[in-house]
Amino acid sequence: MELDMTKGSPAKLITKFIIPIIIGNIFQQLYSMVDTIIVGRFVGVDALAAVGATGSVSFLILGFTQGLTTGFTVLTAQRFGAGDREGMRKSIGSAAILSVIVTIVMTAVSMGGMDSLLRVMNTPEDIFDMTKEYIMIICAGIACNVLYNLLSSILRAIGNSVVPLVLLVIASVTNIVLDYVLIVYGHMGVGGAAYATIISQGLSGVLCLIYIIKSVPTLHIRPEHCRLESQCVKNQLTVGIPMALQFSITAIGTILVQAALNLLGSTVVASYSVSCKVEQLVTQPFAAMGVTMATYCAQNRGINDLDRIRKGVKAANIMSGVYAVLVYGLVYIALPYIVPLFISEQVEMVCGYARTYITICGMFFIPLGMIFIFRNALQGCGFGFMPMMGGVVELLSRGIVAFAAAHLMSYVGVCFANASAWLTAGIFLWIAYHFLMKKMVREKKVHEERMLAGAMQ
């Protein structure tokens, strides 16, 4: 199921590649929502707040590992696009070793420092123990998350977005079933929700490995491929570390928002958690577009077809903009019917807070789409620093607004923290993309002139 994105209509290729990713991401968010619904309705609002309070911490830890594994496989996509199969296999072997190291380090660090981090975040005392229980189990299962993210990223690097979809559907169904069994019948509370998550992730990772072994000989590696060659590692870390830091910088911003939010009480935290679940669901096409553009641009960067990269980015922005407008109106209308799915108490109050959040953030969906497109396009082209700086812009904007909101004890201010981050980072990355594209064009022209001069000698 390989897909060569260096030939054919960019818009058609993007559409073909993105649809399975969107479906997979939506399934992933749906099982996350079901997770929240079951916790909220069968354990209570405090438990819902406890799980919601871990969202930014999970993003910090798992986002860092995801950034690394995704960054490691950008080189795989570039070598696939260039037709260098042996170099591609070496990049896979190197990525596997680096991912094992990352897993060990991140598991130890996250579990060791979690108590202090939750205290710094002003986690309410009435939900502290449940919050810690949930996130510690998630951290213990980092290996499951890394296994799936690495293998699915490798498959996407060669243009296969269908199999990761199938595996996500399987994982989603497994997670929902385990949620219900462990929470409703096993009476395991938030711990049951956490165990359901890591078990389903581990299953999808194992199934992904089995599929590659049985059906994708192109990706089969031998012992000699599993070496940390200096140039290969340098190339992978050049993209992987900035991607990981970009995730972490963004996550730190969300932690600042969560800290401001925690000052407003567990009911507001629960309301914000519901709002974020809805937002994360409807913004999955933006994230899917980002993954698509990383693969599309990496493959075309492998053959240095810059004009084709431009056309793809333009098509992606048009699709993203149209979707942003449509989904904002849809969510605004449907929200009063969605919120009661999550909770059975304090419905009117939670719905009011949720509507405020969606109303404010929904107006900034277009720059959010720009962030995913330009950031991933640049990363696919091998640039790590500017996308990371986009994360810094997000952090500064989100942090300043969150600080002001905490000082004023303002929920509306907290909602504007995310919106301001999307707007400022979207503009920054738009400028960075055009600047670096011009740089690549100049470098290509110089290279072609040198090649021509050499041929004439």
Region spans (language model):
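Transmembrane helical elements of multi-pass membrane transporters/channels
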Residues: 16-35, 137, 171, 200-204, ...
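Short alpha-helical transmembrane segments in multi-pass integral membrane proteins
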Residues: 1-18, 76-141, 185-241, 297-364, ...
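Small-residue-rich hydrophobic transmembrane alpha-helices
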Residues: 48-108, 145-164, 271-335, 368-390
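Helix-terminus/linker motif at the lipid-water interface of multi-pass membrane proteins
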Residues: 30-48, 118-125, 181-188, 248-281, ...
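Short runs within selected transmembrane alpha-helices of multi-pass transporters and secretion channels
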Residues: 69, 137-156, 164-172, 193-208, ...
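N-terminal transmembrane alpha-helices
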Residues: 5-43, 56-71, 75, 100-107, ...
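Residue-level hotspots within the lipid-embedded alpha helices of multi-pass solute transporters
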Residues: 25-29, 63, 103, 107, ...
